[in-house]
Amino acid sequence: MAKKALIIGASSQDGSYLADLLHEKGYEVTGTLRRSTNYTHPNIEHLYGKINIEFADLLDFESIARLVRKHKPDEVYNIAAQSVPADSWNMPFYTAEISAIGPVRVLEAVRQFHPEAKVYQATTREILGNIEAESANEDTRFDANNPYGIAKSYAHMMTRCYRESY
């Protein structure tokens, strides 16, 4: 039986590469799109008919929970985010809802409805602030200096908290 993966944010650059990779490895892939996104998704058009496409929104717990209940994925990848640091200053509430609280909605949906699933939460170097990338490692202190980096720091820490608690 094929492994099942749920990719939240499948139409993003990284999400589409991941969907390609997992499909090639024989996974049954479900990728999400937001209803408010463009009607064309050039990054994943070549996968239409090969992967399942569902609508979900990180602002809406029920849309995520519905997919976890329906597909019972072995692996859940949250690639979605408001991922432009400069824009995070103009949209701090939206950035926090999508990039900080949205991942908690994913974690909670998995905890409540399919706790066997493994969760991958995408992160960014922005959690480290103005550090030189060559000098960073797993022990480097978080020092985010914009709303996007702070939101992703929260998501990272909540993912660790859920992993250690559940």
Describe each region flagged by the PLM.
Residues 1-166:
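N-terminal Rossmann-like NAD(P)+-binding domain of SDR-like oxidoreductases, especially those catalyzing
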